């Protein structure tokens, strides 16, 4: 928010954009950072263990409030343990799926390429784009943003609390998040689906498997019932860590709007309640709300990125930084 406030030559314009960004960040924290994650946890546990969504929502809401009441130190400690655990679980699982079905990998990749570039798909995609191009772009961009949050400016809020004297070094470290999320995690997910042979399979109702149900089928085909448990646990850890991290980002935006930190208790309470609502609401409503919030949040941040591009280039060239691994 303060970057936006000071980035523009006209301070009043910067202040307006900073306030708008803070408002949209608070809304996005309830949407993408909270409700969609709670919905993913509830779906995974319902499909795998048959747990009622209301029960899952209550547990998520209670645990969220208990963690965030401890402040940034408690949030940092929880995510410090959750993130490595979820990464190891998921990377191990997808790696084993690819290794076990490695002989199917070439045909699986070929199936993806043929499905994307065959004449029927190209004709259908072209007609669909001509008829509803904006909707096609909307889904493509929104899912990409949901994957790595690039362009939203949310990660900068968390990076700002890092104890480092060098902004360039911190910027390099923050950039790795997009690479890990999209190139590593998403690529392994796609390769696991391609090699498992579950791509294009249908459920008992005749519907194509997709999303969480597809990945559960992929893990189940390799590990059996244990694979379903492994994936459900991975999704729960991924999603809960995201809920906790986004709470801090939304709280800082709320604090900027309120002018002090005394009123953040109301935000924390509402945040825990929305985690419950996300678990019990329909998936379509949750996604629509999240997409709107993400789009609104990105606009002022991207304006600041353009305005500060020369300053960033100058800082990068004049202040070389050695990254210590």
Predicted regions and their residues:
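Membrane-interface alpha-helices at helix entry/exit sites of multi-pass transporters
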Residues: 12-19, 165-178, 261-266
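Conserved small/polar residues in nucleotide/adenosyl-binding loops
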Residues: 315-321
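Helix-loop junctions at the membrane interface of multi-pass solute transporters
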Residues: 67, 144-149, 155-167, 174-178
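Membrane-interface loop-to-helix entry segments
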Residues: 21, 38-45, 51-60, 64-114, ...
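Extracellular/periplasmic helix-exit of transmembrane alpha-helices
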Residues: 93-111, 122-128, 162, 176, ...
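Helix-loop-helix module between adjacent transmembrane segments
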Residues: 5-39, 43-67, 233-243, 262
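Select transmembrane alpha-helical segments in multipass membrane proteins
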Residues: 12-27, 58, 123-147, 184-186, ...
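Flexible loop linkers connecting adjacent transmembrane helices
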Residues: 1-11, 199, 203-222, 248-257
